[in-house]
Amino acid sequence: YTTNAINKLNLDCIIVGSDEVWNYKEGKGNAAVKFGEGLNCPKLVAYAPSVGKSSVSDDLPEYIVKGLQRFQAISSRDDLTEQFVNSIVNKTPVRVLDPTFLTKFPMQEKSGIKKPYIMFYYCDGMSTELKQTIVKQAHEKGYAVYGAGEGDKLYEDITINLTPFEWIGMFRNAAFVFTGTFHGVVFSILNHRQFQVYMTNESRIK
């Protein structure tokens, strides 16, 4: 939706969130509108946003400072976002659960997977040497190796074109998960999987 399209809906309240919707450095989509820029809605609420790697020490765009001051209610999922918001509006956001913890998700089996497997999900904090060792040992123990949403020539298959429910199914059926992301941790926990974290950056897990 464009800002004009949203305004034409004449909404009474807009809820912004969650995930890294306030990571304005990410560069995906229209970052300004996620801070309320150009929205005519009388009530703006933020649920469990994250600023990702953004910092209050950055040279912040004006739309962020003005935008946050327009929100009637702000919550957050992590420490860095709390600090970020507090430094701008002088209020500490309410700490809330990421919405992925609030509901049960259906799953769908990914076709073509015939044997037990371990899975990598954006594990950028792991060295190439360690990954090669893990893959070698997995093969020796009879496990396939998959990457959910990422590519690496070490994997048997690169399951990039997954539906959301197939993606969940990849976690649910994995023997072990290696991840470097917040939601990689979340879905490993929700599906009671053994997992190991190699942090891409610390704020994404905190």
Sequence positions of predicted segments:
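Structural motif
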Residues: 12-13, 73, 175-176
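Catalytic donor nucleotide-activated moiety binding site of glycosyltransferases and closely related
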Residues: 45-53, 84-85, 122-124, 128-164
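A short beta-strand/loop micro-motif in the catalytic core of glycosyltransferases
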Residues: 71-78, 178
